[in-house]
Amino acid sequence: MRVIVTGGGTGGHIYPALAIAKGILVHQPDAEILYIGTREGMEARLVPEAGLEFAGVSGQGLPRKLSLETLKVGGKSFKALWETKQILKKFKPDLVVGTGGYVAGPVVLTAALFGIPTLLHEQNALPGITNKILTRFVRKVMVTFPESIAHFGVRRKLVLTGLPVRPEIGNISRERGAACLGLRSDCLTLLVTGGSRGARSINQAMPTVLKHLAGRKDIQVIWATGKATYQETLESLKTQGIQWQRENWRVLEYLKDMPEAMACADLFVGRAGATTLAEIMVAGKPGILIPYPLAAENHQEFNARALEKDGAACVILDKDLTGENLWALVQGLIEKPEKLRKMAQAARSLGQPDALNKIVKVCLDTAWK
């Protein structure tokens, strides 16, 4: 069995593609996998590091406004179509799976026009433009959120699978997670993160929350500021007279033990990327979600609203975020254990812990049909 996976531009497209590729190899160890991405994108580094074969093509995201750059990008897209055609002829795949991003467009389209079975996976509640255009050409579209179904024109092609998460998520005990971070397992724990790069607006709001929690030894805080703003954040805490080195607080540059932190957390505060939300749903964690305002097509707000609608999260927009607003939300939840419990149940009910197996089944069924 020969499979091409493609997706790029951001980690939100690349990591699901890698998970799907590895999932196929678990079920079909003799499968040959080729990942097609752009030569300049993150995937050119991440895919070989993951031990998969990589083929690079031309590609670049379309500018939002018509300009000379638009023509240059169009030229690269036509070149990518030609390069993809050569790769397909040589590799002769039984299946092509796209996870979005501009590189997936020419690869999936060319494969479909060649009559090769093709699939898409959409990570967000609001589908990306590439996946919406490609829907008419592919066999099936696998979606993460039920809310995204209304945005696709051909509903008979849609399959709700969820988004693959790390296998450790939801499978680590609270006690083990707390011990890993040197914390107690019997205290209410707040997990705050803006992702690996951090989120300046969240980091600027959190000192106010810490001021309110300074006398609460029964509440623990795990706060990953991100590498880019770590020193800046520590300086801000110092300036505001906040002693952050406490036995029940962890203010970190980067959180390498995210599955463990998720296991011992009672409330999550952070952005609303698809992978993050898939993890908090599988782990059954209520969230205070602050969508990244510059995400393409504002898809993070659509993701966050999907959880809010089902009672699994509260949403505050980045433009409205202040320290006191964030504290009001945190306080309103930590002082109402029953509400927190119901939100956790709602989050868990939305989770798809078996997402990868569902996706792999669709892949194998499509390739062998």
From Swiss-Prot:
BP terms from Gene Ontology: carbohydrate metabolic process; cell division; cell wall organization; lipid glycosylation; peptidoglycan biosynthetic process; regulation of cell shape
UniProt binding sites for UDP-N-acetyl-alpha-D-glucosamine: 10-12, 124, 166, 196, 300
Topology of the protein relative to the lipid bilayer: Peripheral membrane protein
Entry superkingdom: Bacteria
Disulfide bonds: none
Compartments reported by the entry: Cell membrane
Keyword rRNA-binding attached: no
One of the record's GO cellular component terms: plasma membrane
InterPro entries given in the database record: GlcNAc_MurG, Glyco_trans_28_C, GlycoTrans_28_N
Keywords: Cell cycle, Cell division, Cell membrane, Cell shape, Cell wall biogenesis/degradation, Glycosyltransferase, Membrane, Peptidoglycan synthesis, Transferase
Broad class of enzyme this protein falls into: transferase
Reaction(s) catalysed by this chain's protein: di-trans,octa-cis-undecaprenyl diphospho-N-acetyl-alpha-D-muramoyl-L-alanyl-D-glutamyl-meso-2,6-diaminopimeloyl-D-alanyl-D-alanine + UDP-N-acetyl-alpha-D-glucosamine = di-trans,octa-cis-undecaprenyl diphospho-[N-acetyl-alpha-D-glucosaminyl-(1->4)]-N-acetyl-alpha-D-muramoyl-L-alanyl-D-glutamyl-meso-2,6-diaminopimeloyl-D-alanyl-D-alanine + UDP + H(+)
Any GO molecular function: undecaprenyldiphospho-muramoylpentapeptide beta-N-acetylglucosaminyltransferase activity
Coiled-coil boundaries: none
E.C. number(s) listed in UniProt: 2.4.1.227
Pathway as given in its UniProt record: Cell wall biogenesis; peptidoglycan biosynthesis
NCBIfam families in the record: murG
Functional summary from the UniProt entry: Cell wall formation. Catalyzes the transfer of a GlcNAc subunit on undecaprenyl-pyrophosphoryl-MurNAc-pentapeptide (lipid intermediate I) to form undecaprenyl-pyrophosphoryl-MurNAc-(pentapeptide)GlcNAc (lipid intermediate II).
Similarity comment: family membership: Belongs to the glycosyltransferase 28 family. MurG subfamily.
PANTHER family: GLYCOSYLTRANSFERASE, UDP-N-ACETYLGLUCOSAMINE--N-ACETYLMURAMYL-(PENTAPEPTIDE) PYROPHOSPHORYL-UNDECAPRENOL N-ACETYLGLUCOSAMINE TRANSFERASE 1
Protein name as annotated: UDP-N-acetylglucosamine--N-acetylmuramyl-(pentapeptide) pyrophosphoryl-undecaprenol N-acetylglucosamine transferase
Origin species: Desulfitobacterium hafniense (strain DSM 10664 / DCB-2)
